[in-house]
Amino acid sequence: MITLPARPESLTFAPQQSALIVVDMQNAYASQGGYLDLAGFDVSATRPVIDNINTAVAAARAAGMLIIWFQNGWDDQYVEAGGPGSPNYHKSNALKTMRQRPELQGKLLAKGGWDYQLVDELTPQEGDIVLPKPRYSGFFNTPLDSILRSRGIRHLVFTGIATNVCVESTLRDGFFLEYFGIVLEDATHQAGPAFAQQAALFNIETFFGWVSDVESFCHALSPATPLSLAKEKRYA
């Protein structure tokens, strides 16, 4: 068992009965020229997030945690995205961008394309699970719940993009299914202005889960990992 310093309080769990979830670290969300960038969102600050996710993944894997990678998107004909009868058709900024710029049709979030691929710096390894998802929540129309329950996993540590969209949506759905959700705030990034990140983290720590950071996570998994005095005081 480990005790992870977090807000609003520390959380104790067994790493071997927990999962680290990496949400949508695709070129679409983290790279210049990807969907978010083309849709007008700022992705310039994603580099530290990628590095922090790599650090968290390495620590989790060494501790025996299951690593689950999500990729958001659809078939290249966008049948899975839903037609005009689906709210997703009207609210997905990727679909709206392609309607505004027809030359991008078949390129944004299409399975098999560059936009859909995970960024080069993040590579799943043998034993990890990679799951496609067609909507914001990783629980919708995916086997995530079955995968977790069959392994006795109840604690989920979240990283990825976007904090205020797919990360929060998946954590919220997990809360309703009796999962304990923890977000590593410096291993996530928002879609939109900075206040969207802060609002999502406020919602999570106040109503749906817990908020921690990569340094505290790594130190909890391996106490030999140094923890700064500032972090010790932060969660005291």
Swiss-Prot record:
Function noted in UniProt: Hydrolyzes ureidoacrylate to form aminoacrylate and carbamate. The carbamate hydrolyzes spontaneously, thereby releasing one of the nitrogen atoms of the pyrimidine ring as ammonia and one of its carbon atoms as CO2.
Protein's name according to its UniProt entry: Ureidoacrylate amidohydrolase RutB
Keyword Ribonucleoprotein appears in the UniProt entry: no
Keywords noted in UniProt: Hydrolase
Catalytic activity of the protein: (Z)-3-ureidoacrylate + H2O + H(+) = (Z)-3-aminoacrylate + NH4(+) + CO2; (Z)-3-ureidoacrylate + H2O = (Z)-3-aminoacrylate + carbamate + H(+); (Z)-2-methylureidoacrylate + H2O + H(+) = (Z)-2-methylaminoacrylate + NH4(+) + CO2
Known EC number: 3.5.1.110
GO molecular function: hydrolase activity, acting on carbon-nitrogen (but not peptide) bonds, in linear amides
InterPro entries on file: Isochorismatase-like_dom (IPR000868), Isochorismatase-like_hydrls (IPR050272), Isochorismatase-like_sf (IPR036380), RutB (IPR019916)
Keyword tRNA processing in annotation: no
Family per record: Belongs to the isochorismatase family. RutB subfamily.
Pfam families the UniProt entry points to: Isochorismatase
Phylogenetic lineage: Bacteria, Pseudomonadati, Pseudomonadota, Gammaproteobacteria, Enterobacterales
Superkingdom: Bacteria
Active-site residues from the entry: 24 (proton acceptor), 133, 166 (nucleophile)
Gene3D superfamilies registered for this protein in UniProt: Isochorismatase-like
Coiled-coil segments: none
Single biological process term from Gene Ontology: uracil catabolic process
